[in-house]
Amino acid sequence: MKKHKDILLVSASAMPYTIDRLKSLNGNANCLTIAKCENPYIEIQNAQLITHDDLEIIFPDKSFDEISRPLRMVKVFLALVRRKERNIIIGMGGNIRPFHLDIFFAAIILRLFRKNILIMFNTNFLDRERSLIIELAKTFFLLPYKGALCSGPSAAAYIKFLGFKKKKVTNYGFNTINHLRFKDSNHQVNAEKNYFLFVGRMDSKKNIIFLLNVYAEYCNKLGKLALPFHLIGDGPELENYKKLAQDLDLHSVFFAGTQSDIAIAKELSGARALLIPSIYEEWGIVVNEAISLSVPVIVSEHVRAREAIVRQFVNGLIVEPNNQEGWIKSMEIITIDDGFHKKLVEGTRRFKKLSGVESFKKAVDYLVVNTN
């Protein structure tokens, strides 16, 4: 007989860190997803097996984008209102929003049955232009929810602005991973740390054109001392970025395509630093993965992970996404100054707890236990 679970986690589809969160709750939770995969994560999701005994999928054989909207809304609504769990935590991100009509009306009905409906929230004031009318509408559609588990301080401030000032809110816990998932791989951490690494989707938001031009200038400046550059990921602009690397005559750039988490961990373990120059990044979960393997980071100031788990000159460098000289200098220092690099490596230890699923469990315990 299956143990009764008191918590339900809801998301559009499952990623490896979704399973990390589920496992962190020690058998007290189920996870419900809408589809087996979704854009823009399909390549990553298809590159590895993502499963768990407590994971349920409404459309187990379909991508989110293959499901007609009317059918999806009906099935999601019915799946939610039939749930027995006392605490239901609605994810935010990908293709799911707590103010989508199927989610919203299900939340209202669940509240009538005295369910404790919470949300996970990782957006903030700065991720896009805001409209007063839309913001007012959001405050209405967020009324059924009794609390929020947020990614960081800016997300917590934003949700409070949207009507959660008197509700339970955490400013930690959303974007977390199980660090042991990276430590358990069958390889030793490479002590040489002899290349730079980018991990992410190949699209304009990630600012790869800028990064390749920065890398070209870095190579011109350092000559034979310049480190190779590896890029992991797929996406609509991949071929254009490969062509740009050829046009810039970058012989030490390697595009690895989509990789499994085990392969990413192996690449991270040998990286001198992880580079994330994104024009905007809601979080950047790969920063957590870098912390797992004690890898310093150079991140754009618009990567929201830097609010909580990156500190300037402690475990990384924070640079404007259009500051070419700043990026070149940062890469140069990390390349040639072994003492500084060692200091950054040691600094990653400070952020292991906050970036790990222990932080997620702590946030859930706070919201579930203390919310009536």
Predicted segments with their positions:
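Nucleotide-activated donor-binding/catalytic signature segment of Leloir-type glycosyltransferases, i.e.
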Residues: 239-259
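Conserved acidic donor-binding segment of nucleotide-sugar-dependent glycosyltransferases
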Residues: 312-313, 317-324, 331-338
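Aromatic "clamp/platform" in nucleotide-sugar-dependent glycosyltransferases that forms part
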Residues: 279
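Donor nucleotide-sugar binding/catalytic pocket of nucleotide-sugar-dependent glycosyltransferases
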Residues: 143-184, 190-191
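Conserved donor-binding/catalytic core segment of Leloir-type glycosyltransferases
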Residues: 188-217, 230
